[in-house]
Amino acid sequence: MFRRKRTYNWTMVDIHNHMLFGVDDGAKTLEMSLQMLKMAFESGTQKVVLTPHYSPRRGKAPYKLILRNYEILKERVAQEIPGLSLYLGREVYYLSNVFEDIDKVEDSDVDMTDYEWGTMNDVKNDFREKDLKAIRMCGTKNMIIEFSAMTDIDTIRRGISDCFMSGFQPIVAHVERYVCIVKDPLLIADLREMGAYIQINADSIMGVNGPQVKKCVKKLLSEEFVDFVASDAHNLTSRKPILSEARDYVSKKYGEIYAQNIFRNNAIKLLVLEK
């Protein structure tokens, strides 16, 4: 029996993705960025916070380069996808000295000559910032932080504590990737009590990352431990910038009010985005 696809009168916000070109292991070119953003927009995402990696393995592009590419992309988006709004953040990979590393170097030290992500130049230039504003979400105190998949819960707690001590509100990225959380999803309750916000990936809701991860995600959703669902998009194929399928699933299984909160409202409130 044919069933008409449900329509929604609210759009979504993607707070974690790698759609900014030429700065990490996500979009490679300006045209690829535009294709990804068009795909996101056509599937119901109206606001996108671009979050390039700050990671030893996945990219530490100089902030000047990130800003330059961001402004180039914004100009093209205004011309080609006028209903889409772009914002800028950063996804920070937690290491014990990460905040000292960011704080101790000057942006003026950066030499972007022949910069190319994935080269030794990337490692040598590192992340040169005069202060910590460069990794804030849309200029707020919020910051996305990620950990190694094998990180133990004590390290995650320490990372959250370090964020607060450095003046940030942590948003823990894709918590369903961490083995300790997959084994015991209720550990998230402790992280939330510390004040951390919790983000999961849309494809994990749909089972793309395996049955154990999906089981973990279902537990987190049933307990309403999730604050944000994001795409964590890196490309147009295996890691697409599409939230709509996960939104449909969550709306049906856990209610549209909760879905609207974790796909839109929480991001609007937290990041002080225009409604």
Protein language model features and the residues they cover:
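An N-terminally biased module of ancient metal coordination in phosphate/nucleic-acid-related enzymes
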Residues: 1-83
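Active-site mouth loops of central-metabolism enzymes
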Residues: 19-30, 144-151, 205
